[in-house]
A protein has these predicted regions:
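Surface-exposed beta-loop-beta
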Residues: 83-152, 160
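Residues on the lipid-exposed face of transmembrane beta-strands in outer-membrane beta-barrel proteins
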Residues: 1-5, 64-68, 109-113, 151-155, ...
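Short loop/turn motifs that connect adjacent beta-strands in outer-membrane beta-barrel proteins
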Residues: 8-11, 73, 115-123, 158-168, ...
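Outer membrane beta-barrel
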Residues: 1-85, 182-186, 196-222
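Outer-membrane beta-barrel "beta-signal"
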Residues: 276-290
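Outer-membrane beta-barrel translocator domains and adjoining extracellular loop/strand segments
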Residues: 27-33, 88-95, 134-140, 181-186, ...
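Transmembrane beta-barrel strands of outer-membrane/channel proteins
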Residues: 14-20, 78-82, 123-129, 168-176, ...
Length: 290
């Protein structure tokens, strides 16, 4: 539930209400990342919500967002949302919209650059700060405030001269969060998406992506100490959980998209500190638009 309008000038847009902040910030506006099924790609880098009060759809919070266009290519976005960890995923509090359980305020700021042409692109540089007091990892003490920064890129790198609409886009994601209180220290993502892979399939896509989630070294120290105190061996794990994903978006009808998908997860126990076999995941996404 939100209200949005331009204010004073067409360049200034304001949005107020109870809303998911990830709908306006932290992701690529082009929607390229939702050619994948894994939430590590589709949405925003996972360490934003994993290590701060950032919330993505369907979780909503009270807040305000301001966008200002410096030019057709450059835009600044600033927002402020209340942080309420008890409301995330708690259906019993779905209609408790007040700020009673607020622990702080998360303030993101984004600089956005977009250019059109034969090879269009979108670039986002962002920073966020959560004022909540939270427990410091590996300590009984608390830390006042936690933040992070990110860089998101979507750039067309090839366009067919013989088939209109056949374009290859490359994307990149980098996000770093505070090591004092975030279980994720860094997230890296990269990949390509080919639009119109076949002449008779103008709205189909082929997407290939790689993601790497790096656990906080402090969390690993805590796990190693717990294993030592218990007299057990700590597994010889890499320092990250990794993801490789391949998907095909099939536009069956103007309103129905089918997305068969294959994912390979490398070291899925990197965050829990347990030795788990690599996992092969096969899925199918069905998306209907009315």
């Amino acid at each position: 539930m939100s209200y949005e309008r331009t204010l004073f000038t067409p360049a200034l847009n304001v949005k107020l209400g109870y809303m998911a902040m990830g709908n306006d910030l932290g992701g690529l506006d082009s929607g390229i990342l939702c050619n994948f099924m894994n939430a590590g790609f589709c949405g925003h880098p996972l360490n934003m919500s994993g290590g701060s009060g950032w919330a993505n759809y369907p979780n909503a919070h009270l807040g305000a967002r301001v966008k200002y266009d410096f030019s057709p290519a450059w835009q600044l976005r600033v927002a402020a949302f209340n942080v309420d960890p008890s409301s995330n995923g708690n259906s019993s509090r779905a209609w408790h919209l007040g700020p009673k359980h607020t622990t702080g305020t998360v303030v993101p700021i984004e600089l956005v650059y977009k250019h059109a042409g034969t090879l269009p692109g979108e670039y986002k540089l962002g920073y966020y700060y959560d004022s909540s007091d939270v427990k410091r990892i590996g300590s009984n003490k608390t830390v006042s405030g936690r933040g992070g920064h990110y860089l998101l890129i979507d750039q067309a790198v090839w366009s067919s001269s013989t088939s209109a609409g056949r374009v290859l886009h490359a994307f990149g994601q980098y996000s770093a969060a505070s090591e004092a209180a975030s279980p994720f220290s860094k997230w890296y993502g990269a990949g390509v998406v080919l639009y119109k892979p076949f002449e008779g399939r103008p709205r189909d896509t082929v997407a290939l992506g790689y993601g790497r989630a790096v656990p906080n070294p402090r969390s690993r120290d805590v796990q190693e100490l717990a294993a030592f105190n218990a007299g057990t061996d700590y597994p010889n794990l890499n320092n990250a959980e990794q993801l490789i994903e391949l998907s095909y978006g099939y536009q069956a009808t103007p309103w129905l998209t089918l997305r068969p998908d294959v994912q390979y997860i490398i070291e899925p126990g990197a965050f829990s500190g347990t030795e788990i076999d690599n996992a092969l995941v096969v899925g199918l996404q069905v998306k209907a638009v009315f």
